[in-house]
C-alpha cells in the first residue's frame, strides 16, 4: 500500500511530460525512409559494380 501513492505520482508525471513529437521539426530532421533509400541505392550500385567488373573492367569507374 505504501507504493501506491508513489505509483500514482509517477503516472501523473509521465502523462504530463512532453512527448518526442512535441518538439518542432527543423531542416536537419531527415526521415528514416530517406536513409533506407540511400542505403538501398548504395547497395545496388555496389552489386552492379561487383557483377560488372570481372567481365568488363572499364565499367568499374
From Swiss-Prot:
Organism this protein belongs to: Conus ventricosus (Mediterranean cone)
Signal peptide: 1-22
Family, per entry: Belongs to the conotoxin T superfamily.
Database matches in InterPro entries: T-conotoxin
GO cellular component, one term: extracellular region
Protein name (record): Conotoxin Vn-05
UniProt KW keywords: Cleavage on pair of basic residues, Disulfide bond, Secreted, Signal, Toxin
Prosegment location in residue numbers: 23-48
GO MF, one example: toxin activity
Amino acid at each position: 500500500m505504501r507504493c501506491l501513492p508513489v505509483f500514482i505520482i509517477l503516472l501523473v508525471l509521465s502523462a504530463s511530460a512532453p512527448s518526442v513529437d512535441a518538439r518542432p521539426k527543423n531542416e536537419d530532421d531527415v526521415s528514416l525512409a530517406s536513409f533506407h533509400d540511400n542505403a538501398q541505392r548504395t547497395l545496388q550500385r555496389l552489386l552492379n559494380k561487383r557483377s560488372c567488373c570481372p567481365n568488363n573492367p572499364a565499367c568499374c569507374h
